[in-house]
Swiss-Prot record:
Its main location: membrane. It is found in: Cellular thylakoid membrane. GO terms for cellular component: plasma membrane-derived thylakoid membrane; proton-transporting ATP synthase complex. The keyword Membrane applies. It holds the Pfam family ATP-synt_A. It is a multi-pass membrane protein. Key component of the proton channel; it plays a direct role in the translocation of protons across the membrane. It comes from the Bacteria. The keyword Secreted does not apply. It comes from Prochlorococcus marinus (strain MIT 9215). One of its GO terms (molecular function) is proton-transporting ATP synthase activity, rotational mechanism. The lineage of its organism: Bacteria, Bacillati, Cyanobacteriota, Cyanophyceae, Synechococcales. The gene is atpB. This is ATP synthase subunit a. Belongs to the ATPase A chain family. The chain crosses the membrane at residues 30-50, 91-111, 128-148, 193-213, 214-234.
């Protein structure tokens, strides 16, 4: 009886349940848009409160926001370089904050308590469509960075230091977004599934330290994603000699 009950509970942990929105011939994952809008709205409110009354001696939310600004500035300067890092700070900062808030929102907010006609809510970054879209955005960004800074000379990168590297450099353009998207998706989805399984097995105590570990992992994944995005952009604008 216990085994049957346990298997029934595990069966409830389905992966890939979706609320679909049909717009013409396009079918969208509605739950991703809902959670993204909620989290982005919360982030905008947080930033608005922190910048409402700017003071020379920052404290509270303003102090936290200035710390994040300084951290993102240092990250962008280190990875992209002194020359153009300022142009890319808003992009890198937005990526970091969106991934961070999405990851933590999935770990802290009990989305499953909100009932939908079909599917269930969860972290936007636990959906492969979100992470692939973010990774493709990064790819377009470093192509744009290279072309806008070097023009057609950017394509010299593909044959540097020798033309033998051409097929490997082309392959790299495909593996970069794949690694970015699947790393983030896999880690966040795995964290949600592990916590879900433990809640079924021991719902009172054991899931709590695992949730704290998930929060730490989620923050690290946001940092890795933003750092790699900045690194790829820096690689695109770097002058080869």
């Amino acid at each position: 009886m216990f085994l049957n009950s346990l298997l029934t509970n595990f069966a409830a942990l389905e992966v890939g349940q979706h609320l679909y929105w049909q717009i013409g011939n396009i079918r969208l994952h509605g739950q991703v848009f809902l959670t993204s809008w909620i989290l982005l709205g919360a982030l905008l409110v947080f930033i608005s409160l922190g910048t409402k009354k700017m003071e020379n001696d920052p404290k509270g939310l303003q102090n936290l926001l200035e710390f994040l600004w300084d951290y993102i500035r240092d990250l962008a300067r280190t990875q992209i370089g002194e020359k153009v890092y300022r142009d890319w700070m808003p992009f890198i900062g937005t990526l970091f904050l969106f991934v961070f808030v999405s990851n933590w929102g999935g770990a802290l907010i009990p989305w499953r308590l909100i009932k939908l006609p079909s599917g269930e809510l969860g972290a936007p970054t636990a959906d492969i469509n979100t992470t692939i879209a973010l990774a493709l955005l990064v790819s377009l960004s470093y192509f744009y960075a290279g072309l806008s800074n070097k023009g057609w000379r950017y394509f010299e990168y593909y044959v540097h230091p020798t033309p033998i590297m051409l097929p490997f450099k082309i392959l790299e353009d495909f593996t970069k977004p794949l690694s970015l998207s699947f790393r983030l998706f896999g880690n966040i989805l795995a964290d949600e599934l592990v916590v879900g399984v433990l809640v079924f097995l021991v719902p009172l105590i054991l899931p709590i330290p695992v949730m704290f570990l998930g929060l730490f992992t989620s923050a690290i994944q946001a940092l890795i994603f933003a750092t790699l995005a900045a690194y790829y952009i820096g690689e695109a604008v770097e002058e080869h000699h």
